[in-house]
Structures are given as C-alpha cells and as structure tokens.
Amino acid sequence: MSEIILTPKEQPEVPLEAPNIKPDVFAGKSIDEIRNIQIMHGNEVVKLGDFFEVSGEPADSAADIKIIIDGDVYNTKRIGQDMTAGEILVKGNVNMYVGAGMKGGKITVEGNAKSWAGQDMRGGELEIFGDAGDYVGSSYRGDWRGMSGGVITVHGNAGNEIGEYMNGGKIIIKGDVNIMPGIHMNNGLIIIEGNAVARVGGEMAGGTIVVKGMIEEFLPGFKYLGVEKDIEVNGETFPGAYYKFEGDHAIKGAKGMVYAAVGCNGHIEP
C-alpha cells in the first residue's frame, strides 16, 4: 500500500473544511497535484499544500492508498468524508465529521474526535483511540436516517445521542456515554462497555443496545422481560447475566431491545 504523508504546518483559528482528504481524491494524482487539491478555509478556497506538507508515493487506486496525517488536526473538519476505500491514519486529534458518510475503507484516529464522527456512515471502519464528542454515528441534521452500516469503535468516552436514528451497523464505546444513546434507533447494535447517564434507547423502535456498565436513570417506556445469560446478538456473544427490556413503547409497535448488566443495574429491575 502506498503511503502519502500530510504534515500539518499550522492549524488556523478558523477551521479547515477538508472532505477532499481521502484516498478517493488522491488516487491517480501526483504529489504536486495533491498539494493543489482544494479545501475550504472559512469562505475561502485554498490549496491543501497551504496548510500541509505533502510527501510519499502516489497510487492509481484508492484501495492502494494510505494517508498518514502526521500531527494534530484539531481544527480540520470532514476528513475522510464519503470515502469508499483505502486507509487514513491521524496521529493526533481531529475536528468534527471525521468519516461522515463513509462507505468503505478504514480511518484510525490516535487522539480525540469532536462531534458527528461517522455521521450517516454506510460502511467501512472508523476507530478512535481517544474520546469522541456528541452524535457518533448519527443522522444528518433534519434527517431521520442515521448510520446504516460499518463499524465505529471509540476506545474512550463519548457524548450525547450516539447512534441517533441508527439504521444498521455497529457502534462500540469502550468507555462511558452521556444521555440518550440510541435515541430514535431503528436497527443496528450499540455496545456500551462503561456507564450511561440516562435515557438509553429513548423512542427507539428497533435495534439492540447492550450496556455492560450502569445505567443511572432508565426510561419507563420499556417492558421488562426478565434475565438472560450469555446473550447472543448478531452472532456475537456477551457473557454474563443481563436484564432484558423491550421498547421504547412511547413508540407504537416498538421492538427495540436493551440489555443491562445485572451486576451494575439492580436499581432498575422492576
């Protein structure tokens, strides 16, 4: 796999909008042509080379390209947006919308990611080794169709409304989450290995949420179905005992499932 290295010169106060940082756009271009790729700085069209040193070996196919961003890009948005193949490695933090609309390939962020990571994701893999902000794997504002495929893994904590309007795929949060994970969820799987503050699965109609930690406050619209051990969801087994709830029956005909670890959630057992 050919590696193209982007070294940030300086992160400006006004964020960069850089959906063109992806293998699909770099494919078939020389290093000089990559330097001249357009990105946005506020309302101004600028060149990638104005803000990044560019080096490495180009390739003709997106699937054969790995983009390495060798530094912190905390004020660069939309990296990897709509990408279909190849890899991106970010050796630092990223701003909003990393991997939004992603359809294939892999993005790895070694630091933190701000809100809307993996928004409207269709496929591929997004892995964040730090924390993520709000709306991981959510829908576009005003839409009712969120993430429908792919896998998002956050090794740290995440914020509010992860998996909002989720329609498929899988989200794994290895730390804690804030309020309303899985709100309006229709399909897919959310795994929370830490704790959740409140309103898990609010107005969900389908899909599955597994919480291995504590749910501090649970919604009343879920029907308690008892305790299950070593549950299996989509071919994946979760050892241990879980309280099983169906809902959210604030939605007519809801068939969503929430599993909460027995050892942490005696306070929500009916």
From Swiss-Prot:
Activity control mechanisms: Not inactivated by cyanide.
Induction: By growth on tungsten or molybdenum under anaerobic conditions.
The protein's Enzyme Commission number: 1.2.7.12
Pathway: One-carbon metabolism; methanogenesis from CO(2); 5,10-methenyl-5,6,7,8-tetrahydromethanopterin from CO(2): step 1/3
Enzyme class: oxidoreductase
SUPFAM superfamilies, A to Z: Alpha subunit of glutamate synthase, C-terminal domain (SSF69336)
Keywords: Methanogenesis, Oxidoreductase, Repeat
Sequence repeats: 80-92, 99-111, 118-130, 144-156, 163-175, 182-194, 201-213
Catalytic activity as recorded in UniProt: N-formylmethanofuran + 2 oxidized [2Fe-2S]-[ferredoxin] + H2O = methanofuran + 2 reduced [2Fe-2S]-[ferredoxin] + CO2 + H(+)
GO annotation (BP), single: methanogenesis, from carbon dioxide
Record Gene3D superfamilies: Glutamate synthase, alpha subunit, C-terminal domain
Family stated for the protein in its record: Belongs to the FwdC/FmdC family.
Subunit structure: This enzyme is composed of seven subunits FwdA (65 kDa), FwdB (53 kDa), FwdC (31 kDa), FwdD (15 kDa), FwdE, FwdF and FwdG.
Entry function: Catalyzes the reversible oxidation of CO(2) and methanofuran (MFR) to N-formylmethanofuran (CHO-MFR). Can only oxidize formylmethanofuran. This enzyme is oxygen-labile.
Protein name listed in UniProt: Tungsten-containing formylmethanofuran dehydrogenase 2 subunit C
Provenance organism: Methanothermobacter thermautotrophicus (strain ATCC 29096 / DSM 1053 / JCM 10044 / NBRC 100330 / Delta H)
Taxonomic placement: Archaea, Methanobacteriati, Methanobacteriota, Methanomada group, Methanobacteria
Gene: fwdC
